[in-house]
């Protein structure tokens, strides 16, 4: 993925096509979701998510004011770093968890979330490698990923979730 400095995106300030078009240009499949509920606005979104800029622009006209989902699965997975917020003031702070490990988000596609957390998107290893990212909360990261990024294998990361096969991030 490209430089995080060029791709940091604040979801709270996005109401247009900047986000989905930039994701698509980097090979991340996107689809429209309802801004309030984060629910997909198209049927069969896992199959319909696309990097086709013309399709994305057509969806923007069809669903004005929609938000956008980035599909995760075989080619891309996301690390979702949560923070405490008004509706969950006692939630774990994922940034604090990662800081306690002296771990920083590697150079990748990132986005500040609506509640002040972060989504960091990564290319998934080829399926034939045997590696598989599944969607899970309080993630125990895969051993090879942990080794590569310096996180203890099997460590549960409070406030850090993985979005993998069948998942998406907003």
Predicted features, each with a name:
Residues 1-170:
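Conserved phosphate/metal-binding and DNA-contacting active-site motifs used
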């Amino acid at each position: 993925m490209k430089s995080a400095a060029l791709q940091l995106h604040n979801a709270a300030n996005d109401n247009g096509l900047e986000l989905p078009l930039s994701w698509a240009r980097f090979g991340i499949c996107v689809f429209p979701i309802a801004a309030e509920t984060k629910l997909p606005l198209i049927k069969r979104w896992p199959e319909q998510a696309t990097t086709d800029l013309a399709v994305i622009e057509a969806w923007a006209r069809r669903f004005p004011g929609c938000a956008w989902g980035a599909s995760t699965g075989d080619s891309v997975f996301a690390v979702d770093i949560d923070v405490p917020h008004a509706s969950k003031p006692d939630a774990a702070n994922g940034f604090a968890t990662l800081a306690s490990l002296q771990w920083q988000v590697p150079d990748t596609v990132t986005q500040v979330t609506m509640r002040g957390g972060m989504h960091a998107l990564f290319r998934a290893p080829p399926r034939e490698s045997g590696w598989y990212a599944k969607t899970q909360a309080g993630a125990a990261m895969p051993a090879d990923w942990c080794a590569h990024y310096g996180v203890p294998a099997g460590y549960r990361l409070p406030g850090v979730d993985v979005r993998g096969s069948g998942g998406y991030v907003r």
